[in-house]
Amino acid sequence: MRPQRCHPVGSKFSDRRKSATRCPMKKILWCLFILPILHSSVQAEDRIRIGFPELIASYSTLPLGQKRGFLKEEGLQAEFIRMNSTVGLATLITGDIDYYTTLGAGVAAAIGRVPVKIVACYVPGPTATLIARPEFKSVLELRGKIIGINVFGGNLEIIARNVFKHYGLDPDKDVKFLAGGPLQARFSSMTQGLIAATLGGPPADFLGKKMGFVVLARAHELFSFPVTGVFTSVKKIKERPDEIKRVIKAGIKANRYIRQNRDGTIQEMMEWLKIDKEMATATYDSVGKGFNEDGSLPEDGLRLLIEESKKAAKVSREIALSEVADLSILREAQKELGIK
């Protein structure tokens, strides 16, 4: 048996052994101190679920806000779920999602006395363009022609009707609408001469030009018609106003980024929309300036949206703006961001 060596207290070897014994204890104590801090930091991010209907540029605000860290700055972590407006409304009311982003669906639901309200708007004008066969040089030349839309009664028909009204044409008498399904099917009908023109959101204008068609009008240059933003349940407005304010602020920051950072936004659109750079660039150039910088909901556009929704639902009673929108939290968010 090897004899144990004894080292006097205070010797170098004894001090090293004490140090080696103390170090693990220090590390353990440090971990016990820092882990709750890290845990609380992670827990500080509230998880929210946001519904959207389709992968198009006008719904880019909050996904870009997530990617660029604007939601994180507000202590939020979002999950984005693609769903149509019918499912979106149902899951909003049950609390399975927190927000939905198609404002037309929110207005229609509120008019139908579903307890939801718009709290912010990020794209205040319609992004659709009127695209025609090359022989047509103006909107007025479409008098008496067949215009393709996706479905009857949808937003695209509403936008089309208002485009023709803007140019002095009666959409019920001067043109005929034909429901032709998806954009590519309508482009095919245009190529065959079955319809004279159609409407579509980006990148419809880019694709149409590549096929030899011409853009006759951009709806957002003609009138306000709130397209995307945030609406939520009345219950959440009452119970979680601070969370709503943080969502609104993140969206405003994202919109400012979109308007001020062309290259960065094009890259984000490529990734989120799964399109190539050429198409993303054309999409940005078509709609980039359509995003607002303050989250405001234009009153004239909201009134138009209400009237069109009333017609579709055959509702005759007067609808106050306060029935479909609550902008008190938006004003607080704007104030905190220095927006007058």
Task: Please name every model-derived segment.
Residues 25-28:
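Positively charged n-region of N-terminal signal peptides that target proteins for export
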Residues 64-65, 128-137, 227-242, 290:
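A bilobed periplasmic-binding-protein/Venus flytrap-type ligand-binding module shared by bacterial periplasmic
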Residues 239-317:
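Secondary-structure end/capping motifs
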Residues 30-39:
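Bacterial N-terminal signal peptides
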Residues 40-44:
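Sec/Tat signal peptide C-region and signal peptidase I cleavage site
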Residues 310-340:
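Conserved C-terminal helix/tail region of periplasmic/extracytoplasmic solute-binding proteins
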Residues 45-182, 186-192, 196-202, 214-219, ...:
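Short, glycine-/small- and polar/acidic-enriched structural segments
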Residues 104-105, 177, 182-273:
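Pocket-lining segment of extracytoplasmic ligand-binding domains
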